[in-house]
């Protein structure tokens, strides 16, 4: 099972031309922390753990920070929901448990000279390096597989899940047949019981997806829509100009 992650096309490609971004184990660690959140004893414990993880992530490569930030929010809302906090208290706890680790991580990154070479925001190519909605199914010529037409020519959009993962997904879908209605009812029941955590989690996940897609929404070779945002937002966004990378957390969640 570990080979599905270690030998994934995306990691292998990164290992040969961008080793820092091959350190995607940090994403798996973040997902594990979200799953294991109930084992964390308190808000202070969670804050300390994510402070260490976020600092490690940004020192490996700043592109990991937005993804890990979203996972941190999911972990925090899980703890808040488990503790049964409500009203303003839970929002206050959420802000503290997320802002403090992020501020410490960015502060340490600044102290080690992380901003000394600039932000890269002067390069405006968000449209060409955004996440294509068919990236998971397009091999882009990986190994002996053919490449399907793709709107972008950037290699950043290569997120082929791998033939083994797709076979596994099709097999799981076939084995799951007849249980879709039961699963849907369970999801609805969970939503009613934990509507706050579900809404917050869905919101931050959608925001990360929008961030990854960029200012041009592509589906294979076609562009559905291209939009503009105010210049200050665009410049800040352009600091993560290869925004497709922010979809890596969805990549690994799909495999899991």
Placement of each model-derived feature along the sequence:
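Membrane-interface helix-loop-helix junctions at transmembrane boundaries of multi-pass membrane enzymes
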Residues: 83-94, 169-224
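Helical transmembrane-bundle signal
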Residues: 5, 33, 68, 72, ...
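Short aromatic-rich membrane-water interface segments that cap or initiate transmembrane helices
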Residues: 10-13, 58-61, 145-159, 232-247
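Membrane-interface helix-loop junctions at the exits of transmembrane helices
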Residues: 1-17, 106-117, 133-144, 199-241
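Membrane-water interface of alpha-helical transmembrane segments
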Residues: 36, 44, 54, 58, ...
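Periplasmic/ER-lumenal interhelical loops and adjacent helix-loop junctions
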Residues: 94, 98, 103-179, 248
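Membrane-embedded alpha-helical segments of multi-pass membrane proteins
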Residues: 21-30, 69, 161-164, 246-254
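Membrane-embedded helix bundles of polyisoprenyl
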Residues: 1-38, 43-80, 97-105
């Amino acid at each position: 099972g570990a080979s599905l992650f270690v030998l994934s096309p995306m990691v292998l490609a990164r290992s040969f031309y961008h080793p820092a971004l091959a350190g995607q184990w940090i994403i798996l660690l973040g997902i594990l922390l979200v799953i294991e959140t109930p084992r964390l004893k308190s808000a202070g414990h969670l804050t300390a753990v994510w402070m260490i993880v976020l600092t490690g992530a940004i020192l490996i490569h700043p592109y990991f920070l937005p993804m890990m930030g979203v996972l941190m929010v999911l972990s925090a809302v899980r703890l808040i929901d488990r503790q049964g906090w409500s009203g303003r208290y839970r929002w206050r706890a959420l802000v503290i448990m997320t802002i403090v680790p992020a501020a410490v991580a960015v502060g340490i990154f600044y102290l080690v000279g992380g901003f000394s070479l600039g932000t890269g925001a002067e390069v405006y190519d968000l449209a060409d390096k955004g996440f294509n909605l068919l990236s998971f199914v397009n091999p882009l010529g990986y190994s002996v597989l053919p490449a399907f037409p793709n709107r972008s020519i950037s290699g950043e959009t290569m997120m082929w899940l791998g033939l083994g993962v797709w076979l596994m997904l099709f097999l799981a879908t076939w084995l799951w047949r007849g249980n879709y209605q039961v699963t849907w009812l369970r999801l609805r029941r969970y939503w009613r019981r934990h509507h706050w955590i579900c809404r917050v989690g869905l919101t931050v996940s959608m925001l990360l997806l929008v961030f990854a897609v960029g200012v041009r929404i592509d589906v294979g070779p076609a562009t559905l829509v291209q939009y503009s945002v105010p210049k200050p937002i665009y410049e800040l966004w352009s600091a993560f100009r290869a925004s497709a990378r922010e979809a890596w957390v969805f990549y690994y969640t799909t495999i899991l």
